[in-house]
């Protein structure tokens, strides 16, 4: 397995991004043959991810004061904003309507793969038990809004909202935090999970045991580029790692200082340095 150098990754990290409108233990990591990895949300994660692009417009998720939500479609040609429903007489306020989302989560996001829409509900960790105040969930829907599958993440798991969702070979890839309460103490584990679009099965794929946080920021070929946090001398240290999902190799690319940031744009990964310079 040829390792990619720091320079190679930072200069030529290719990813296909969804537009705004628009060591370690492994489970099942050796039978994957990926060569078309790409991002399906922005590298900044799920925050304010209310739109998903489409060839003729964009999908939008809008939440009401009741807590429930609907999917709308903004048509660029007709300049119309309509509920994603063929039932013109519907009030769009119950689960019989394909645009309706029943949710008690603390945040909703929407994204699109090649074949499906996904509604993502962001959970909130409880403070006193091994459950969530709100569960994280994933809804797989037809592009017309109809429900295909709906699953809740395990009760002690939340999406890492600062990381992107990636897709390839009919699977979604996303990072999670798994927490466990022991008396008054709490411990955390960090996993990469997959969701199979064909079978609807959610599976643990890779456990990050050498870092204390991991979030996807870019994807290309067989590689997921991760921004991670290490503990160095008891202090957190941000760094960039790569995970080869075909070989399960997880290797470090570089450290980041407190003043250095990464930004994904136009199929490249950019580094903003402390002297305010930007390098690809």
Please report, for each region that a protein language model flagged, where it lies by residue.
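Bacterial N-terminal signal peptides that target proteins for export
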Residues: 2-10
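Gram-negative bacterial Sec-dependent N-terminal signal peptides
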Residues: 9-18
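C-terminal motif of bacterial Sec signal peptides marking the signal peptidase cleavage site
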Residues: 20-23
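Surface-exposed loop/turn elements that mediate protein-protein interactions on large endomembrane-trafficking
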Residues: 26-42, 67-94, 129-155, 183-208, ...
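N-terminal export/targeting and maturation segments
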Residues: 33-67
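Repeated scaffold domains used in trafficking and secretory/extracellular systems
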Residues: 44-54, 95-111, 157-169, 210-221, ...
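Residue position within the beta-strands of beta-propeller blades
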Residues: 59-61, 118-121, 173-176, 225-228, ...
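Active-site-adjacent structural elements in enzyme catalytic domains
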Residues: 113, 122-126
């Amino acid at each position: 397995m040829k390792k990619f150098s720091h320079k190679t990754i930072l200069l030529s990290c290719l990813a296909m991004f969804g537009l705004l409108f628009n060591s370690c233990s492994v489970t099942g990591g050796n039978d994957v043959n990926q060569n078309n990895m790409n991002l399906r949300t922005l590298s900044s994660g799920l925050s304010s991810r209310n739109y998903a692009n489409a060839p003729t417009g964009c999908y939008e998720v809008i939440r009401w004061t009741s807590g429930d939500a609907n999917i709308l479609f903004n048509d660029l040609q007709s300049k119309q904003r309509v509920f994603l429903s063929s039932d013109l007489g519907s009030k769009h306020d119950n689960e019989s309507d394909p645009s309706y989302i029943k949710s008690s989560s603390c945040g909703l996001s929407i994204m699109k793969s090649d074949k499906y829409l996904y509604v993502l509900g962001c959970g909130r960790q409880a403070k006193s038990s091994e459950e969530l105040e709100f569960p994280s969930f994933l809804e797989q829907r037809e592009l017309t809004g109809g429900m295909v599958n709906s699953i809740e993440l395990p009760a002690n798991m939340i999406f890492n909202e600062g990381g992107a969702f990636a897709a390839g070979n009919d699977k979604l890839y996303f990072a999670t935090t798994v927490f466990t309460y022991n008396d008054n103490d709490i411990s955390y584990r960090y996993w990469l999970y997959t969701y199979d679009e064909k079978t609807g099965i959610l599976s643990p794929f890779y456990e990050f045991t050498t870092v204390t946080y991991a979030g996807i920021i870019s994807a290309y070929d067989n590689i997921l580029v991760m921004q991670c946090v290490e503990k160095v001398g008891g202090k957190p240290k941000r760094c960039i790692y790569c995970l080869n999902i075909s070989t399960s190799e997880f290797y470090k690319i570089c450290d980041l200082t407190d003043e250095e940031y990464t930004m994904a744009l136009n199929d490249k990964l950019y580094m903003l340095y402390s002297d305010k310079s930007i390098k690809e």
